C-alpha cells in the first residue's frame, strides 16, 4: 500500500508509475475517495463535538430548571447529521481501501522504463564451470538414468509433477542443507514457516489479483498453500512494533505450491516450471535508511552462492513493465541452461520499501519515546531446488551421462558424481 502522503502530494509521479508499469488503474477515483473520506471524517468530528456540547448544555439546562425542548431537538438533529456523515465516511473509506489495496508500488528511479522483458538490462555475467559441448536436456538425462520419473507423477498427480529418485533426492536435499548452512553462517535466522496461510496475511504480502490464479486455495477454508515462504515471513510480524534490533534477516525453507496457470505451453518438459518444489528464501526487515544497502547485500550473497556452486549466470535489472507490482526494484539472476542454450531466471531479488509493511502494519522504533515508523521489507530467492537441479544436470554432465556434484554439495551427497 502506498503512503497516502505520496498519493496526495505527488499524483503526477503516481500516474507516471502506473504508465511505466502498463497498469490500468483509476487514480482519479482513488484521489476522489481519499478527499471525500477525509472531508467526512472532519465533518463527523466537528458534529461529534457540537453534539457533545449540546448534550452538556441540555444537562446544564436541567440543573438550572430551564426548558430543554429546543436544546434536545438540536441534539437529536446533530445526531442524525452525524449518523449521515459517518455513513458517508465509511462508504468513502471502503471505496478508498478497495482501490488503495490494488495500486502497485512506486518504482525506483534506477529502474529502466519499458513495456516488458525486452527493456531489461543485463548488468554482468559470470562464466562459471565449462559447460558440455553437446549436452542432453535435464529431463532426458535424468529420466534415462532412472533419477526422475515424470510419467508416473503425471499418472498420480497430473502434469508438472515429478518423482525424484536415488541420488537426485540426495542432491535436492544437499541443496537445501547447503543453502541453510550458507545463510546461517552469514547472520540469517533459519525459519520453517507454516505451509498454509490465511487470505488476509496473503493480501498483506501481495496484491490479491496477482495470487488468485497462482496459488492453491483450500476448499471451504480461509487458507492457501504458500507459493513461497516470502509471504509467510512477511506476515510473521504483522500488527507488531519491532523494538530495535533491525535488520531482521530470515532464511525461510519450505515447499512451494503454484498453479502456473499462465504457463501454458512453457517448459512443458522437465522440472524447471512445476507445481511443487522446495525453496530457500531470504527475507529482511530493515530500517528505511538501510534498505538499499540490504538489497545490495542480498544480491552479493546470492551471487557468492552461485559462484560457489560454479553455475554460470548473469544479473539482470528488470524493467518497469516486467517487475512485480509490490517491488520498487528487482534484480533477477538467470542461470545458463546448457541444453537450452539460454539463460533462465532462478532468482528474484527485490526491495519493496514500506509497501508490504503498510499493508501488514509492521512498524519499528529504536527507543520507547520515539514515534514508530514502517519497516522496509526485502526478499530474494537463494535456491529454488527444482530449477537448480535442472541447471546442475545440464551444466555438470559428462559424455557418459555422469553428473558431477558441485564441490560445496559433495559432503552432503557423499560422492563427487552421480
UniProtKB/Swiss-Prot annotation:
Keywords, comma-separated and alphabetical: Aminoacyl-tRNA synthetase, ATP-binding, Cytoplasm, Ligase, Nucleotide-binding, Protein biosynthesis
Cellular component GO terms, alphabetical: cytoplasm
SUPFAM superfamilies named in the record: Class II aaRS and biotin synthetases, tRNA-binding arm
Positions contributing to ATP binding: 258-260, 274, 345-348
Pathway the protein takes part in: Aminoacyl-tRNA biosynthesis; selenocysteinyl-tRNA(Sec) biosynthesis; L-seryl-tRNA(Sec) from L-serine and tRNA(Sec): step 1/1
GO molecular function (one): ATP binding
Protein localization: Cytoplasm
Matches recorded under InterPro entries: aa-tRNA-synt_IIb, aa-tRNA-synth_II, aa-tRNA-synth_II/BPL/LPL, Ser-tRNA-ligase_type_1, Ser-tRNA-synth_1_N, SerRS_1_N_sf, SerRS_core, tRNA-bd_arm
Function recorded in the entry: Catalyzes the attachment of serine to tRNA(Ser). Is also able to aminoacylate tRNA(Sec) with serine, to form the misacylated tRNA L-seryl-tRNA(Sec), which will be further converted into selenocysteinyl-tRNA(Sec).
Oligomer and partners: Homodimer. The tRNA molecule binds across the dimer.
Record text about domains: Consists of two distinct domains, a catalytic core and a N-terminal extension that is involved in tRNA binding.
Alphabetical list of PANTHER family matching this protein: SERYL-TRNA SYNTHETASE
Protein name: Serine--tRNA ligase
Protein source organism: Cenarchaeum symbiosum (strain A)
Native organism taxonomy: Archaea, Nitrososphaerota, Candidatus Cenarchaeales, Candidatus Cenarchaeaceae, Candidatus Cenarchaeum
Amino acid at each position: 500500500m502506498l503512503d497516502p502522503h505520496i498519493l496526495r502530494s505527488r499524483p503526477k509521479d503516481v500516474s507516471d508509475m502506473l504508465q511505466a508499469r502498463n497498469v490500468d488503474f483509476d487514480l482519479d477515483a482513488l484521489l476522489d475517495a481519499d478527499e471525500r473520506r477525509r472531508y467526512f471524517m472532519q465533518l463527523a468530528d466537528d458534529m461529534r463535538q457540537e453534539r457533545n456540547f449540546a448534550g452538556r448544555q441540555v444537562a446544564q439546562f436541567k440543573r438550572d430548571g430551564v426548558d430543554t425542548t429546543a436544546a434536545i431537538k438540536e441534539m437529536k438533529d446533530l445526531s442524525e447529521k452525524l449518523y449521515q456523515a459517518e455513513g458517508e465516511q465509511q462508504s468513502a473509506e471502503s471505496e478508498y481501501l478497495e482501490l488503495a489495496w490494488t495500486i502497485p508500488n512506486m518504482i525506483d528511479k534506477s529502474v529502466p522504463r519499458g513495456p516488458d522483458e525486452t527493456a531489461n538490462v543485463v548488468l554482468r555475467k559470470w562464466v562459471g564451470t565449462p559447460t558440455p559441448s553437446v549436452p542432453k536436456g535435464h529431463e532426458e538425462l535424468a529420466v534415462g538414468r532412472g533419477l526422475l520419473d515424470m510419467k508416473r507423477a503425471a499418472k498420480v498427480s497430473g502434469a508438472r509433477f515429478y518423482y525424484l529418485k536415488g541420488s537426485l533426492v540426495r542432491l535436492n536435499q544437499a541443496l537445501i542443507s547447503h543453502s541453510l548452512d550458507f545463510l546461517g553462517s552469514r547472520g540469517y535466522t533459519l525459519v520453517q514457516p507454516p505451509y498454509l496461510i490465511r487470505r488476509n496475511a496473503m493480501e498483506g504480502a501481495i496484491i490479491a489479483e496477482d495470487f488468485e490464479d497462482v496459488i492453491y486455495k483450500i476448499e471451504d477454508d480461509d487458507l492457501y498453500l504458500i507459493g513461497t515462504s516470502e509471504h509467510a515471513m512477511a506476515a510473521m510480524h504483522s500488527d507488531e512494533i519491532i523494538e530495535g534490533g533491525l535488520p531482521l534477516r530470515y532464511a525461510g525453507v519450505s515447499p512451494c505450491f503454484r498453479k502456473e496457470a499462465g504457463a501454458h505451453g512453457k517448459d512443458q518438459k522437465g522440472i524447471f516450471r512445476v507445481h511443487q518444489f522446495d525453496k530457500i528464501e531470504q527475507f529482511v526487515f530493515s530500517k528505511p535508511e538501510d534498505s538499499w544497502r540490504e538489497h545490495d547485500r542480498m544480491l552479493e550473497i546470492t551471487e557468492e552462492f552461485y559462484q560457489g556452486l560454479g553455475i554460470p549466470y548473469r544479473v539482470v535489472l528488470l524493467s518497469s513493465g516486467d517487475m512485480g507490482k509490490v517491488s520498487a526494484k528487482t534484480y533477477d539472476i538467470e542461470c545458463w541452461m546448457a541444453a537450452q542454450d539460454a539463460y533462465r531466471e532462478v532468482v528474484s531479488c527485490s526491495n519493496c520499501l514500506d509497501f508490504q509493511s503498510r499493508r501488514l502494519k509492521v512498524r519499528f522504533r529504536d527507543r520507547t519515546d520515539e514515534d514508530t515508523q514502517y519497516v522496509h521489507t526485502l526478499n530474494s530467492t537463494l535456491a529454488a531446488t527444482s530449477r537448480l537441479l535442472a541447471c546442475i544436470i545440464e551444466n555438470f554432465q559428462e559424455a557418459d551421462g555422469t553428473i558431477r556434484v558441485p564441490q560445496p554439495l559433495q559432503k552432503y551427497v557423499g560422492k563427487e558424481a552421480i
